[in-house]
Amino acid sequence: GRIHSYSQFVENYNLARKLGFNNINIDLIFGLPDENLEEWTEDLKRVIELRPEHISTYSLIIEEDTPFFKLYNDGRLNLPEEELERDMYRRTLDLLIKAGYHQYEISNFSLEGKECRHNLVYWNLEDYIACGTGAHSYSGGVRYKNAHTIEEYLELMKAKGNAFVSVHENSQKDDIEEFIFMGMRKIDGIS
């Protein structure tokens, strides 16, 4: 999780606006431990009041090998029931649509013309080049994965001019499966 307060978040959001950023996304997670529908609704309303161009909302997923996973396995996390999570999602749809946002993907909402181009590149199986440690790229039907540590990254760059630790050429079947799988996230589906 992120270690900051709501007031710090608002301060940074306003600073970004002051510096000229005119297309801001805010990521939110619902279904947090001990969270209820009223708290989620209030959080969402406060974000809507800021009027970011894009809002992403995700249901909390407990990943293995994380502190939450250990707490969950020890029975020390009071997570909302599935029905409450569904209510939170429905509330999200209701509030964001009423506020003028349109849903173009399962978790993503934007003002008109402000869809996240970065995400659409993935979901439409278009080429993208990523740089730096741990980065993944997809170009010309080939997937590339860079070294995770800066030491290995620099070593590989010096030795061979790239930092790839994995190169996978997608088959036509791979591309079709990925296009369908990723396209299913979009409200428009696949075409």
Each PLM stretch: what is its role?
Residues 1-191:
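C-terminal scaffold of the Radical SAM
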